[in-house]
Amino acid sequence: MSQKEQTLMTPYLQFNRHQWAALRDSVPMTLTEDEITRLKGINEDLSLEEVAEIYLPLSRLLNFYISSNLRRQAVLEQFLGTNGQRIPYIISIAGSVAVGKSTTARVLQALLSRWPEHRHVELITTDGFLHPNSVLKERGLMKKKGFPQSYDMHRLVKFVSDLKSGVPQATAPVYSHLIYDVIPDGDKTVAQPDILILEGLNVLQSGMDYPHDPHHVFVSDFVDFSIYVDAPEELLKSWYINRFLKFREGAFTDPDSYFHNYAKLSKEEAVDIATSLWNEINLMNLKENILPTRERASLIMTKSANHSVNQVRLRK
């Protein structure tokens, strides 16, 4: 089978970096270098070039989709003779631990909020919808954090469903990576945003991923556009270990950190522990629960070294 025939058979349009960058058209750069520095993750090299060549074309595409969605809503309101409720456009961002989902989410939030049509862009991570440590310990799931059974999926689905139903406001629990737990009474209020960006390991999962907790509605049912941030397994492992080493010298040194004891490790000991955590927990979760959802995404961004995106696949 020729490459052209294979391309015609795939559900995705495929772009290399140069082809994707050309789709920026004339969209202006609205972020400064200082802003980009604040947006990037602890383990990433995010440059103006990366934002210009990858994220500006993506924000342009999303703006087209969002504008089309608003026109569709207006047609429905005209047909029904109703006043429009503010229904957010929901973008989900999935991918492995350490792949850079949070940076992608923050950059898109910053770029999309600068478009004149939709200023109010909220970002919520699904970490907040993990069961509290007390519940996970009771159920023997502390080593399964991030796996499907560790989430309060009913609460997450209700949160997204409420926003899509046009409720004036909804609350989302907030997770602290410092204390490695959901913050008690730390809920964040989300009030009718134009766009909601939902970032997490589990946002592309569906009923087949939750056989232990059967229910009929899932987060993915409410998502308008989904992004999967992808990278080769060996890079993900390397990024995870490097991030762990940086935390060892930074966040873990805080006496309040759940992982404060890790700050006392030698570099060799830290690498051994990070490698073990990757192999026994994160790699297993990736293979069993995250990677199988990749082909459900509207768009797949594939990263190479230094977290630079070298391929984009867009669902036809």
From Swiss-Prot:
Its EC number is 2.7.1.33. The keyword Transit peptide does not apply. ATP binds at residues 95-102. InterPro entries: P-loop_NTPase (IPR027417), PanK (IPR004566), PRK/URK (IPR006083). It is an enzyme of class 2 (transferase). Pfam families: PRK. It is found in: Cytoplasm. Keywords: ATP-binding, Coenzyme A biosynthesis, Cytoplasm, Kinase, Nucleotide-binding, Transferase. GO terms for molecular function: ATP binding; pantothenate kinase activity. GO terms for biological process: coenzyme A biosynthetic process. PANTHER family: URIDINE KINASE. This is Pantothenate kinase. It comes from Klebsiella pneumoniae (strain 342). The lineage of its organism: Bacteria, Pseudomonadati, Pseudomonadota, Gammaproteobacteria, Enterobacterales.
